[in-house]
Amino acid sequence: TIFSKIAAGEISSYKCAENEQFYAFLDIDQVTKGHTLVVPRKEVDYIFDMDDDELAAFEVFAKKVARAIKTVFPCKKVAQVVLGLEVNHAHIHLLPMNSEADVNFKHHVQVEAEEQKEIAEKIFKAFQELE
């Protein structure tokens, strides 16, 4: 899938976090600044097709990424959204939010490439500091 290629480095991305099992990167269509996708490196079509141990590890990784996002973007909460109809590869959307209106996938914010790079680097650094 496209997410497998991104996680493998075959397609460029703004990396926010990674480990042996999972990869997190900025969504190219930012709903809010800091909108991050978390994917398993192993191709799994649907999040609930993952076995229990994989799903638990996936959520723990996403939680750590969410904590890093909240460090960079002080907000009330980091929303976790699972949709998965566009790409047949399990993934979690993490979005900094201060109200439910911030999680409107019909709305996107324009974030220039240089700013996306800076955001990803800040989230990556915050993620590393949580180690």
Please state what every model-predicted region is:
Residues 1-131:
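HIT superfamily nucleotide-processing domains
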